[in-house]
Amino acid sequence: MLPTLFSSTILAGALAGSAMAQAPDAGCVLPSEPKGIPAAIDAAITGPADKDRACMKALLIREARMMFVSLGADGAPTYTLQTLDDWIARVKARGHTMLEEKQLKFHTDRYGNIAHIWSSYALYSDGKQVARGINSIQAIKEAGGWRVTGIMVQAESATAPLPKKYLPYGRQA
């Protein structure tokens, strides 16, 4: 349950030097390039579970959906589809629990005003690693910067470990 709940906590990492643009209606910043999305998501997520999510709301378009894929007992994939408000309510229920998602490795593909970011992550709750997985993020360029249109997440499991190529320097740890 914990990896499924938190695998939605999306991306992390410190990306220095990416220019940011003002986000609509929240006083937050939007990335000026798709490669800045992981750092923007990290900043919007990291902190107490019940913190204000205005920056996360500014980063995702209103119609954005988050899909959490998991494997059932029979190994068949299942999914849960949520709005950002659904996700915020689930995370907020954890109270002051500290959340932190650390990006392990990512790459970005861009064509014109659309981009896809494929990112592996490790998720921490109160300093303890509770999950790892992959985030598939779609984004669009708007006048104020890049915004997320959708996120699909699958947490690592015993039958679906993270491949070496998605870990820093190819490590399996």
Model-derived regions, located:
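Short, low-complexity N-terminal intrinsically disordered segments enriched in polar/charged residues
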Residues: 2, 21-59, 166-172
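Short beta-strand edge/turn micro-motifs at domain boundaries
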Residues: 132-160
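A mature extracytoplasmic/lumenal domain signature
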Residues: 60, 70-72, 119-121, 135, ...
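Hydrophobic pocket/interface hotspot
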Residues: 56, 64, 117, 139
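A short, polar/proline- and glycine-enriched secondary-structure boundary/capping micro-motif
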Residues: 77-79, 127-130, 158-165
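Sec/Tat-exported extracytoplasmic proteins
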Residues: 41-49, 60-64, 68, 88-91, ...
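Bacterial N-terminal signal peptides
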Residues: 4-17
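Surface-exposed, charged secondary-structure patches
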Residues: 22, 26, 30, 65-66, ...
